[in-house]
Amino acid sequence: MSVNYKSVIAMVDDALNLVEIVEEHPCPNGSEWVIYQYQRTSPLILSAWREGNKHHFVTKIGKEKLNLVPSLSAAGIEEVYIENNRVHIVYAGLAGGGVGAELRKGAKNVLEVNILEKGGGSRLGKAEVITPKMEKVIIGIDDTDTKEEGATWVLAHEIGLEVEKEGLGYYLDHTIVQLYPGNPNKTQNCVSIALSFAVYPEYKYKLDKFIKKLLKERSLSDETAMAVYYGLFPSKSMKLFALKAKKEMVKIEEAKSIALRNNIKIIPINGEGGIIGAVAALGLAEHHSLAPKLCEDIKL
């Protein structure tokens, strides 16, 4: 078949014993069926969502037998385990739901696909997909422009592309976070940026050095700063700080306190003015519907 998944990425959080799987489906909205069926069928899956034709699954590490029923629970993930820095994902499904596992062969970042049972027609299909073990790193960036020129969101996106080009990992996401519009120190719209990456473990602590260098070279502001968070999910305290930074002025000391509590690395590039926005961006990096909103439009 010529229809293949474009990429499969598996990020592991060893402390939580969880894996986030991100797959780029070959069809524009075909991933909606996958999200619905996999979540209904798979006890291993804790949460699932779609962004365009990419689907995300957060799974436990382990094995759970699937109770496959046509139409009702037609396909899912049966097993996820880590071995020799590789993530093994076992998919199973009925009819077309079983063929999908085979179509991950040839996808970017997939090392190997082992067909366990050949699917198609009315048959059960089962396959094991193997990817490198990766980890998630989220970078908050703020204050790179001036009132005369520049745009932080554009520079951040360029940096994301440079990271992928350099081979350090995959550029997953770019989130624009609206902050307090009444800030007298703002350039104009008062936003900061969160960039999310899937990174190979050996590059985990090299990523920030690479981004720091690019910001130092390209930032136009004297107050540029970045913040680095290692993990799948920003904490509740990080989210609450970000929401507060939407509502009112906050002090740098509060941002530093949140960073200390959550093992966030703060890196001033040209100054400390951007620390608040950089830390705040991390808290809403995974909350795409909340991130761009003004405080008065958020109902929690």
Curated annotation (Swiss-Prot):
Disulfide bonds: none annotated. InterPro entries: Methan_mark_11, TiaS-like_TCKD. It comes from the Archaea. PANTHER family: DUF1743 DOMAIN-CONTAINING PROTEIN, TRNA(ILE2) 2-AGMATINYLCYTIDINE SYNTHETASE TIAS. This is Uncharacterized protein MJ0921. It comes from Methanocaldococcus jannaschii (strain ATCC 43067 / DSM 2661 / JAL-1 / JCM 10045 / NBRC 100440). The lineage of its organism: Archaea, Methanobacteriati, Methanobacteriota, Methanomada group, Methanococci.
